[in-house]
Amino acid sequence: MYPDDSLTLHTDLYQINMMQVYFDQGIHDKKAVFEVYFRQQPFNNGYAVFAGLERIVHYLKDLRFSDSDIAYLESLGYHGAFLDYLRNFKLELTVRSAQEGGLVFANEPIVQVEGPLAQCQLVETALLNIVNFQTLIATKAARIRSVIEDEPLMEFGTRRAQEMDAAIWGTRAAVIGGANGTSNVRAGKIFGIPVLGTHAHALVQVYGNDYEAFKAYASTHRDCVFLVDTYDTLRIGVPAAIQVARELGDKINFKGVRIDSGDIAYISKKVRQQLDEAGYPDAKIYASNDLDENTILNLKMQHAKIDVWGVGTKLITAYDQPALGAVYKIVAIEDETGKMRNTIKLSSNAEKVSTPGKKQVWRITSREKGKSEGDYITYDGVDVSDMTEIKMFHPTYTYIKKTVRNFDAVPLLVDIFKEGTLVYDLPSLTYIQDYARKEFDKLWDEYKRVLNPQHYPVDLARDIWQDKMDLIDKMRKEALGEGEEE
């Protein structure tokens, strides 16, 4: 059976299992707080670009159990009273999130979910699915953008994406990260992204030679970018493109040629020479062929003559790191008295120990230099913008510290839903792109390096750090038995 449009059951089975446990024990409506964060920067990068909020909003707005959902869950053995609870499900969650296009960093909350425990549990899988994928693609695009600077970047990866939804949402994420357009027509229609298409090698093969193929294409399409590497780029493809451009003159807009194979650095220089000598200095050279930021960086070091970059497989699949690794952890739970109790997850791996409590992240920016000095994590309700001085220190290597003065502090997490009601106006994609560029400009160059960037400071307020240490000590003592030594 073809799947319906409902995403409510886009979750792991154990979420439903836990929801029924909470329901049976009468704690399903207990208030809880969960936070999404990732532990390491993707691609060993100095930053990540947050993406996925728009899809999160649509997912949560439409969250309800259909009759077919209930029937299927009944077939899995869930009991009647619990199914009645699901049948009457109404979103009551309060959600805060980073804004799309904003820079985010490891070990800070980027989405925060508060509300009835069972509802918080239900949405975990979908939220992680969305954030893990889209943030990864946006970050990959930003890395490529940082290497090519102001040159056009086209997303060409649809056929290599992990299925159709990944292709269109991945395209949108790539645009947030810095792509100028896409070859994906559906993404262009849905999101208003500029679309660009040339033609494939098949066109040349159908006609048997470049000249006839280019002439046929030009008879239908005025804007012409000819793919010149089907047989021989320099001896056949480019000369044929020039011949067609000359013969048709002003009847077409000869925009340039595309190279999809071979030694692109060497070939592009020769192609540039051929085009210039033929009187087409404004014709652009488009390059594709399994490009990414590392390949492009090397091509630029070799002074390749590329004007437009088409990046497909390695962008849309985040080829060198296929998973962001974001997690969703409970940080506070309502106790028997109705008060919120901070909670922590311990681990033998230090990086997997969670940070307790409902928090806010503050982006600290120097007023004098206009650059971000770091992110400062406080308990929710603390207003850092009123402070005149912040003493920041590394939460693990506490001897690494600095004092910041004369700063602006902007909260990272903004209100999206309040008790199930959407309170956030989704911005246009153009606005998100502009916001992303402005946020990126605030980052010091040391954090932007593609290779071995400097570590961006993400520091805990002293009271959070101390509470975390105290909770670790308390939980370990309880696990070992009161008074026992480890």
Show which residues each predicted segment covers.
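N-terminal, Lys/Arg-enriched amphipathic/low-complexity engagement segments
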Residues: 30-88
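Short coil/turn segments at secondary-structure boundaries
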Residues: 71-72, 139-143, 157, 448-455
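Gly/Ser/Thr/Ala-enriched C-terminal appendages of enzymes
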Residues: 1-30, 44-45, 278, 283, ...
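Short, positively charged
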Residues: 75-83, 163, 389-397
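Buried, small/hydrophobic-residue-enriched core segments of structured protein domains
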Residues: 1-31, 40-42, 77, 83-92, ...
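A residue-level signal for beta-strand positions that form part of recognition/binding surfaces
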Residues: 33-35, 92, 153, 327, ...
